[in-house]
């Protein structure tokens, strides 16, 4: 995927306004729903198993975020993945805090194993832990650099036959065909809770219109976050400015600002 294809994907997303089913955490529901709306997608936060078969029959993609995981949520997540598979829909998994507890690590691996078409989006420590290596994390925050997770991402991509997105100071996307390096974003972004969860939700929106790599969402959020941070005094205003920037983001801005390197 190149810059022009990312621009075309954004235009298609805004035209089609895909419905994205989110089983996500309590902390970020408002953030991620607003980000999806600002970009042009249609979010629904559906957590009931009783309606999931219907939801997956007409939605574009399924986003699963294990940020506030518990025994009530887990069977719902597994059932949702089953329904996504039955309807040939992409599953986007955010393994929040993978490596911080056995519950999170095991659940993330089980979901990844179950999904037929999968994108995994996490920080470096989460991806390293998912691969079964020793990671440095503090709760859900990464202490590993994104560069250090590249080997783990390649392993995870092979293990689960999926695309892997590593968020960090530098973002990486690993697919079967290529590795992508993206150098946008801003150092202020990690000070807003749920920024990675927003990244995952946007990945679901682009997956719903055909980008099964995660590259388009990574590019769009990186450029939008960079611009929004330049206009912000701190994390509070960054949250608001990010929504405005996602809404206003255009072809010329992406073309001029995106820093994308592709290694095929």
Curated annotation (Swiss-Prot):
This is Hydroxyethylthiazole kinase. It holds the Pfam family HK. It catalyses: 5-(2-hydroxyethyl)-4-methylthiazole + ATP = 4-methyl-5-(2-phosphooxyethyl)-thiazole + ADP + H(+). Pathway: Cofactor biosynthesis; thiamine diphosphate biosynthesis; 4-methyl-5-(2-phosphoethyl)-thiazole from 5-(2-hydroxyethyl)-4-methylthiazole: step 1/1. Its cofactor is Mg(2+). Catalyzes the phosphorylation of the hydroxyl group of 4-methyl-5-beta-hydroxyethylthiazole (THZ). Gene3D superfamilies: 3.40.1190.20. GO terms for biological process: thiamine biosynthetic process; thiamine diphosphate biosynthetic process. Keywords: ATP-binding, Kinase, Magnesium, Metal-binding, Nucleotide-binding, Thiamine biosynthesis, Transferase.
């Amino acid at each position: 995927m190149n810059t022009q294809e990312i621009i075309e994907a954004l235009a298609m997303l805004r035209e089609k306004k895909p419905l994205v089913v989110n089983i996500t955490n309590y902390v970020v529901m408002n953030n991620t729903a607003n980000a999806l709306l600002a970009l042009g997608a249609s979010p629904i936060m559906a957590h009931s198993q009783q309606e999931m078969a219907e939801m997956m029959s007409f939605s574009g993609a399924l986003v699963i975020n294990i940020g506030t995981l518990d025994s009530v949520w887990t069977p719902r997540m597994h059932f949702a993945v089953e329904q996504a598979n039955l309807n040939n829909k992409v599953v986007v998994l955010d393994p929040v805090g993978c490596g911080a507890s056995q519950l999170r690590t095991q659940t993330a691996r089980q979901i990844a194993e179950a999904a037929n078409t999968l994108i995994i989006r996490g920080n470096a420590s989460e991806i390293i832990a998912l691969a079964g290596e020793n990671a440095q994390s503090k709760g859900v925050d990464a202490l590993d650099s994104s560069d250090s997770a590249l080997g783990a991402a390649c392993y995870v991509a092979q293990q689960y036959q999926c695309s892997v997105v590593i968020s960090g100071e530098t973002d990486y996307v690993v697919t079967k065909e290529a590795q992508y390096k993206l150098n946008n974003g801003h150092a202020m972004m990690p000070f807003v809770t749920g920024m990675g969860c927003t990244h995952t939700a946007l990945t679901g929106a682009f997956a719903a219109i055909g980008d099964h790599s995660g590259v388009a969402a990574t590019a769009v959020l990186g450029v939008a976050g960079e611009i929004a941070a330049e206009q912000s005094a701190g994390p509070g205003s960054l949250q608001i400015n990010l929504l405005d920037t996602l809404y206003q983001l255009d072809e010329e801005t992406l073309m001029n600002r995106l820093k994308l390197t592709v290694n095929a």
